[in-house]
Amino acid sequence: MVTHAAGARTFCEEQKKGSTYSVPKSKEKLMEKHSQEARQADRESEKPVDSLHPGAGTAKHPPPAASLEEKPDVKQKSSRKKVVVPQIIITRASNETLVSCSSSGSDQQRTIREPEDWGPYRRHRNPSTADAYNSHLKE
């Protein structure tokens, strides 16, 4: 195991040295990220090697690295399944007319009209607020 990890390190180091000079800056950033990930993988591979040495501080059950890596994947898959995509339903205008029973008993359609005198709230109904304040002061 130790020789395999050391071989992986030299391979990564060779990749870094060979690609640093010939790759544009944006690709260099990607390579740095990959090299950092490789370093983390090397550190993780070294941890079980150190824990294999017998000693008073060793645990009876070492944590399995594979099961720890699988758990985030399971959470991501389950969260993807729970996402509900909203559906947009396109409809057209309705041809229905509302019929209300009034005291007069007529079935004719009515238009809702705004009262002409709004009192102190009139200034909010005008298109220009400056005109609303001027007309309020004159009254």
UniProtKB/Swiss-Prot annotation:
Keywords: Autophagy, Cytoplasm, Mitochondrion, Nucleus, Phosphoprotein
Biased composition (Basic and acidic residues): 25-50, 110-120
Motif (PQIIIT) on chain: 86-91
Disulfide bonding pattern of the chain: none
Location(s), subcellular: Cytoplasm, Cytosol; Nucleus; Cytoplasm; Mitochondrion
InterPro entries found in the cross-reference section: DUF4609
GO biological process, alphabetically ordered: mitophagy
One family name in Pfam for this protein: DUF4609
UniProt GO cellular component terms: cytoplasm; cytosol; mitochondrion; nucleus; sperm midpiece; sperm mitochondrial sheath
Region (Disordered) residue spans: 1-83, 97-139
Region (Interaction with VDAC2): 68-139
Annotated segments matching region Interaction with ATG16L1: 1-67
Modified residues (Phosphoserine): 94
Extent of Polar residues compositional bias: 97-109
Function: Plays an important role in sperm motility and male fertility. Required for sperm midpiece flexibility and for the localization of sperm calcineurin to the mitochondria. Promotes mitophagy as well as acts as an autophagy mediator in male germline cells. Links damaged mitochondria to autophagosomes via its binding to the outer mitochondrial membrane protein VDAC2, as well as to key autophagy machinery component ATG16L1.
Quaternary structure, from the entry: Interacts (via PQIIIT motif) with PPP3R1, PPP3R2, PPP3CA, PPP3CB and PPP3CC. Interacts with VDAC2. Interacts with ATG16L1 (via WD repeats).
Name of the molecule in the record: Spermatogenesis-associated protein 33
Organism: Homo sapiens (Human)
Top-level taxonomy: Eukaryota, Metazoa, Chordata, Craniata, Vertebrata
Encoding gene (name): SPATA33
